[in-house]
Curated annotation (Swiss-Prot):
Protein's UniProt keywords contain Cell inner membrane: yes
Species of provenance: Burkholderia multivorans (strain ATCC 17616 / 249)
InterPro entries documented for this protein: Lgt (IPR001640)
Keywords: Cell inner membrane, Cell membrane, Membrane, Transferase, Transmembrane, Transmembrane helix
UniProt-listed NCBIfam families: lgt
UniProt keyword Ligase, yes or no: no
Protein name as catalogued: Phosphatidylglycerol--prolipoprotein diacylglyceryl transferase
PROSITE patterns, per database record: LGT
Phylogenetic placement of the source organism: Bacteria, Pseudomonadati, Pseudomonadota, Betaproteobacteria, Burkholderiales
TM region positions: 17-37, 59-79, 97-117, 230-250, 257-277
HAMAP family hit by this protein: Lgt
Function: Catalyzes the transfer of the diacylglyceryl group from phosphatidylglycerol to the sulfhydryl group of the N-terminal cysteine of a prolipoprotein, the first step in the formation of mature lipoproteins.
Root EC class: transferase
């Protein structure tokens, strides 16, 4: 078993200001997105659409707003609506944490629609350009989660080579033991807990980096290197992220205030299913539209 390093969440102290790793990871993600975007500008079919470096900078501004506002509102509405209805001012306490990818995704989508309207472009043309830039940011965000030792995975077999002990999960581990006597006996978890006061868990943040970040980036980046029907790159992002998130959620610990929902699925899985369906529908529409246009030419 591997013990999580339990990093200091503060990366740098600048006088009274504490710069946290999680915030730095957001910065790294946005910088990586700019780099990927500028690489894409060199592709002939992208350059032919008239994209410029200034467009990337402007899209970044819209993207930051969409990510922060959408991510926060998504967390409030999807995960803890009851709490925030009773404590409305706590919505603004962003420093206490609480962001949702699915909310951030909706926020960025709306921001790109607004950007497209201002630039007189079709919004799918904008999202097709942006989609390959997103996974690097997702990977950076999940790395921030791992550094913070948060959003850990479900309890697993201590003999698994990937099993990791998370000091931040001690309280959850103690509460987990009496609820799962079969697994405690099967995996001899009582002995593990007596020795470490922790239980082995999946490092699900690393799984998400691998699937939602690295794998999705390469799939999108190489798919988008060739001209595709409008909407196809966006569709592949929806399908790819939805499948990656849905899969990883089987290893990720559900939010303790929600648990598992209908059919034994987590909130993250239920929010990912519409993305997959929408992505498939958009992909079919994109290629049918191109075939129709080619037949009419």
């Amino acid at each position: 078993m591997i013990i999580h390093p339990n990093f200091d969440p503060v990366a740098i102290h600048l006088g009274p200001l504490a710069v946290r790793w999680y915030g730095l990871m957001y910065l790294v993600g946005f910088i990586a997105a700019i780099v990927v975007g500028r690489i894409r500008l060199k592709l002939p079919h992208v350059a032919a659409q008239g994209w410029t470096a200034k467009d990337i900078d402007d899209m970044l501004f819209y993207g930051v707003l969409g990510t922060v506002l959408g991510g926060r509102l998504g967390y409030v509405l999807f995960y803890k609506a009851g709490f925030y209805l009773s404590h409305p001012l706590d919505v603004f306490k962003v420093w206490e944490g609480g962001m949702s990818f699915h909310g951030g995704f909706l926020g960025v989508t709306l921001a790109m629609v607004l950007f497209a309207w201002q630039r007189k472009r079709h919004w799918l043309q904008v999202t097709d350009f942006v989609a390959p830039m997103v996974p690097t940011g997702l990977a950076a965000g999940r790395l921030g989660n791992f550094i913070n030792g948060e959003l850990w995975g479900r309890v697993t077999d201590p003999g698994a080579p990937w099993a990791m002990l998370f000091p931040g999960a001690m309280r959850d581990d103690a509460a987990w033991l009496p609820k799962h006597p079969e697994l405690v006996e099967k995996w001899h978890l009582a002995d593990v807990f007596m020795q470490y006061q922790m239980l082995p868990r999946h490092p699900s943040q690393l799984y998400e980096i691998a699937l939602e970040g690295v794998a999705l980036f390469f799939v999108l980046f190489f798919f988008a290197r060739k001209p595709r029907p409008m909407g196809a790159v966006s569709a592949l992002f929806l399908i790819g992220y939805g499948l990656a998130r849905f899969t990883v959620e089987f290893a990720r610990e559900p939010d303790d205030f929600l648990g598992l929902l209908a059919l034994g699925l987590s909130m993250g899985q239920w929010l990912s299913l519409p993305m997959i369906v929408a992505g498939i529908a958009l992909m079919v529409w994109a290629y049918r539209r191109r075939r129709t246009a080619a037949a009419a030419a």
